[in-house]
From Swiss-Prot:
Residues 28-245 form the GB1/RHD3-type G domain. Gene3D superfamilies: P-loop containing nucleotide triphosphate hydrolases (3.40.50.300). This is Protein SEY1 homolog 2. The lineage of its organism: Eukaryota, Metamonada, Parabasalia, Trichomonadida, Trichomonadidae. GO terms for biological process: endoplasmic reticulum membrane fusion.
Length: 792
């Protein structure tokens, strides 16, 4: 090494190269520092060269005494890791009066860097103020106090090398030098914090005499060898580096430290050694951290980065690869930074970890997202593979929850196995759980709804059959039977649903409004059935009017009270209409609101009146036909028996002639046999009526146009009798018919009556205006409000 600070007080530009070439940069903290100060031309460079094998420039005696070392020079010991600083001598002629300022700066620099400060002085100068460099010593003491103020440093070792020593009693020289040092210390104004301190609290003074190099060469060489051992032989009790010094900085940061230190000293700023050390530590730690991060980024680029056009895939060895790379990066940083301030090293290490974490975290999140996507994919596959219906004894929810738990454990394990040490990353896997939970709840709701719909659909089949049977009968218990059926089927549906839900899902039960579903469905069935209300009324009328109670077709005779039968049959048909007038599905425990469908009007008043009119027009034909049959029978019964006998006798020849023909004879036997059998069974009247109906139907088909015209006329006019009624005066009968017509010309029950209160009753006539039962008259066109029939 050569000059590091010029005589003008400027740092050389190639300081880094010089420190590196000396080998100190690679020494870490395993090196020592020694600085030497003293008067100009006192042999400072010479003694360093002799002690450490360096090649500092020395004075050329042929040119006389002059300034040889300008500024500060540095060199490494040839055989030992000791960095030497050769400081420009004081009291030089060249500097003159400006010497004091540079002397102070160089002394402060030497004390700040060196573990041992060597003061080279002549024995002959001891005891003289200027000659013994008392001002220089005073400067050393003052700047050392300044260092102590800035840091709690170790004592400064000051080695006085007494040149050209001739004293027999060296102790006397030491005493005299100590006296001078004490006097200097007493003149120094100590800070308040150091009041009462002795100079021994700040300095460790050592003394070593060296004989004259020319006159006493052998002794001089022996003295140099002895002094060298103080620097390079640790076992020696006088070894100067026995104690660990706080002044040594890591070799790789020494150049930066020197640069910062001299900048502060040269600008006369307050020197803060700990601050400078911290600055150096931060600088080097930043430098090492940047290099470690660069190496790590290279690893990421080579192993983790993927082509943007390629799909992201799971990296199987993600954690081992990253663990190893992170470990290498941190190891590189620690190996190159551990010599600096521990606090700074740890602080920057934490920052480096965060920087590495910031680089790795996106890759970690990407891997975790793939795990989550794979988990959801497996979950969806499982949901699709299981039965899509709930069954008795099934365990749908527990099976799904078990799968979710298993997938969640796998996901957490994958995330944990992907987390790189020493980072504590957390991936929000709860989002996956939320998605699976929502999907499960949605699927559960769908299956429960599907189950209810399936069970209700199955129940509806039998319900429709039973409900239609009830609606077809249209009796007084129709609404009671419908309510009982609804109650029964809704209870069964609820029980069946809960039986399936009990083992499949928890906390879910059948809907409370299942009964309402059946009620609503029943209303639709009733409305559908009400579309055929006229047909139902006609069928009910026919069952009563045209058939006996035992189900046989009615054969009308003069003994039948046709008017009463007609009235009863007509009332039965009208009762069907009343049953369908309004809905009666509400029960006592049902919550019925205003305008509730369970109590709604099914057939409005105006519509009911129209239906009744149509019903009246339809059933009148059956009444007229029955009257015609009775009249025909009456006419037949008026022919006397002798007339039939006379007719038979007059026709006997013709009859015998017919019977002589085998064909007619066979027909007569067959017809006679059939008639005898029917008579024995009591079915002759039924057979007669059937034949007459067939005959009449045939006639109607043959005279279709005429019948249609007659039908239109009958709808607009009252039917007239074609034959006089037997056993009654024709004139009296017409007067009675006129009276009956006037009495029953009122509107029908649904035209004249109003719905009252709950609509439970309507009025119909209670007595027949017809007189004698044996005198059949035309049926009443309408009913008077004299009879009350309760609604069911």
């Amino acid at each position: 090494m050569e000059q590091i600070i010029t005589g003008d007080g400027a740092l050389v530009s190639n300081l880094d190269e010089k420190i590196t070439s000396s080998g100190i940069a690679d020494a870490g903290v395993d090196y020592h520092t020694v600085a030497i100060i003293g008067p100009q031309s006192s042999g400072k460079s010479t003694i360093l060269n002799l002690l450490f094998g360096t090649k500092f420039a020395t004075m050329n005696e042929q040119r006389g005494r002059q300034q040889t070392t300008q500024g500060i020079h540095a060199a490494k010991s040839v055989n030992d890791p000791i960095l030497l600083f050769d400081v420009e001598g004081c009291d030089s002629r060249e500097r003159g009066d400006s010497d004091a300022l540079f002397e102070r700066k160089s002394a402060l620099f030497a004390l700040a860097l060196s573990e041992v400060l060597v003061i080279n002085m002549w024995e002959s100068d001891i005891g003289r103020y200027q000659a013994s460099n008392i001002p220089m010593l005073k400067t050393v003491f003052e700047v050392n106090i300044q260092l102590f103020l800035a840091q709690n440093t170790t004592k400064s070792k000051i080695l006085f090398v007494i040149r050209d020593s001739t004293a027999v009693n060296f102790e006397a020289i030491k005493f005299q030098l100590n006296r001078d040092i004490t006097n200097i210390w007493d003149e120094i104004n100590l800070p308040d914090s150091f009041k009462g301190k002795q100079m021994e609290d700040f300095f460790e003074f050592l003394y070593f005499p060296i004989h004259h190099m020319v006159i006493q060469r052998d002794q001089f060489d022996a003295d140099v060898n002895t002094l060298r051992k103080w620097f390079n032989e640790p076992p020696l009790k006088d070894y100067l580096f026995a104690e660990k010094s706080t002044k040594v900085v890591p070799g790789e940061g020494l150049s930066q430290y020197i640069r910062n230190l001299w900048e502060v000293i040269n600008e006369n700023k307050e020197l803060n050694i700990p601050s400078q050390r911290t600055m150096l530590a931060r600088f080097k730690c930043d430098e090492n951290a940047a290099e470690a991060l660069s190496k790590f980024n290279k690893f990421v680029e080579e192993n983790l980065q993927r082509d943007p056009d390629q799909p992201i895939t799971i990296i199987q060895d993600f954690k081992p690869l990253c663990d190893k790379s992170v470990e290498n990066a941190l190891k590189y940083y620690h190996d190159n930074s551990w010599r600096y301030s521990e606090a700074v090293v740890k602080e920057r290490e934490a920052q480096l970890k965060q920087e590495i974490s910031d680089v790795l975290l996106p890759y970690f999140n990407s891997q975790c997202k793939l795990f989550c996507d794979n988990t959801l994919k497996r979950f969806n596959e499982f949901i699709s593979s299981i039965d899509q219906e709930l069954h008795v004894g099934g365990t749908w929810e527990s099976d799904v929850q078990g799968k979710i738990d298993s997938l969640n454990m796998d996901l957490k394990k994958n995330i944990k196995d992907t987390t790189v040490e020493p980072f504590s990353w957390n991936y929000p896997d709860y989002e996956v759980m939320k998605v699976m939970f929502n999907a499960t709840e949605s699927m559960k709701g769908k299956l429960v709804k599907q189950l209810e719909q399936t069970i209700i659909t199955e129940q509806m089949r039998s319900f429709d059959e039973q409900a239609n049977d009830i609606l077809a009968k249209v009796d007084n218990l129709m609404w009671d039977n419908l309510r009982n059926l609804i109650r029964k089927v809704s209870t069964e549906t609820t029980q069946n649903t809960n039986q399936v839900l009990k083992t499949n899902v928890s906390g879910v039960h059948a809907r409370n409004d299942i009964k309402r579903d059946f009620q609503t469905h029943t209303i639709s069935l009733v409305r559908e059935s009400a579309n055929y209300i006229v047909l139902k009324m006609k069928n009910t009328f026919d069952r009563t009017f045209k058939y006996e109670k035992n189900g046989r077709p009615r054969v009308w005779t003069r003994r039948d009270n046709i008017n009463q039968i007609y009235e009863n049959s007509r009332d039965a048909g009208l009762k069907v209409l009343r049953h369908f007038t309004y809905c009666r599905l509400a029960e006592s425990d049902d919550e019925v609101k205003p305008n509730d469908p369970l109590t709604q009007v099914l057939i409005p008043h105006e519509r009911a009146s129209e239906i009744e009119d149509k019903f009246e027009r339809i059933i009148i034909h059956a009444y007229e036909e029955a009257r015609a049959n009775i009249k025909a029978q009456a006419n037949r019964e008026q022919i006397p028996g002798w007339a039939w006998l006379a007719t038979f006798l007059c026709s006997s020849n013709y009859i015998m002639k017919l019977l002589a023909n085998p064909i007619f004879f066979a027909l007569a036997v067959i017809i006679g046999g059939i008639y005898s059998i029917l008579r024995m069974l009591g079915l002759q009247d039924v057979a007669k009526k059937t034949l007459l109906d067939k005959f009449n139907s045939l006639l109607k088909n043959l005279t279709k146009d005429e019948n249609e015209q007659e039908k239109e006329g009958e709808e607009n006019e009252e039917p007239e009798e074609d034959q006089p009624l037997p056993n009654n005066n024709r004139k009296r009968m017409k007067l009675m018919e006129k009276s009956v017509s006037q009495e029953f010309s009122q509107k029908s029950i649904y035209k004249s009556s109003e719905y009252k209160g709950s609509g439970d009753s309507l009025m119909i006539p209670q007595t027949s205006p017809l007189g004698n039962n044996d005198s059949p008259e035309k049926p009443r066109d309408s009913l008077t409000r004299t009879q009350s029939l309760e609604f069911m």
